[in-house]
């Protein structure tokens, strides 16, 4: 019973990877559209996009760390 609940917790925490992937894809697409409309601002747009994606990726990294901790600490 307890191992099953741990497995469910690991699965739920890894669902955040799906959200992060979708969010980063949308951000990259919108950045490409913005550069297409205003090529002179490409460096500012790229910098802002990379900072935003780094912040979003940190959530996925935290979820991965939590999943690994659940997997090895409680088994």
Swiss-Prot record:
Q: Which HAMAP family match?
A: ATP_synth_c_bact (MF_01396)
The record's family statement is: Belongs to the ATPase C chain family.
Assembly, in brief, is: F-type ATPases have 2 components, F(1) - the catalytic core - and F(0) - the membrane proton channel. F(1) has five subunits: alpha(3), beta(3), gamma(1), delta(1), epsilon(1). F(0) has three main subunits: a(1), b(2) and c(10-14). The alpha and beta chains form an alternating ring which encloses part of the gamma chain. F(1) is attached to F(0) by a central stalk formed by the gamma and epsilon chains, while a peripheral stalk is formed by the delta and b chains.
Q: Which InterPro entries match?
A: ATP_synth_csu_bac/chlpt (IPR005953), ATP_synth_F0_csu (IPR000454), ATP_synth_F0_csu_DDCD_BS (IPR020537), ATPase_proteolipid_c-like_dom (IPR002379), F/V-ATP_Csub_sf (IPR035921)
The record's annotation in Pfam families points to: ATP-synt_C
The protein's name is ATP synthase subunit c
Q: Which organism is it from?
A: Mycoplasmopsis agalactiae (strain NCTC 10123 / CIP 59.7 / PG2) (Mycoplasma agalactiae)
Gene3D superfamilies given for it?
lithium bound rotor ring of v- atpase
Residue spans making up a coiled coil are none
- Asked if the Swiss-Prot or TrEMBL record annotates the protein with the keyword Ion transport, the reply is yes
Q: Does the keyword Zinc apply?
A: no
* Highest taxon of source: Bacteria
Q: Which residues cross the membrane?
A: 4-24, 54-74
Q: Which GO terms describe its molecular function?
A: lipid binding; proton-transporting ATP synthase activity, rotational mechanism
User: What does the record give as the organism's lineage?
Assistant: Bacteria, Bacillati, Mycoplasmatota, Mycoplasmoidales, Metamycoplasmataceae
Q: Where is the secretion signal located? A: none
């Amino acid at each position: 019973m307890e191992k099953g609940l741990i497995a469910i917790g690991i699965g739920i925490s890894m669902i955040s990877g799906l959200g992060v992937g979708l969010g980063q894809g949308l951000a990259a697409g919108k950045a490409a559209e913005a550069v297409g409309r205003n090529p002179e601002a490409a460096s500012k747009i790229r910098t802002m996009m990379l900072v935003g994606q780094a912040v979003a990726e940190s959530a996925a990294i935290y979820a991965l760390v939590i999943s690994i901790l659940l997997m090895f600490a409680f088994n």
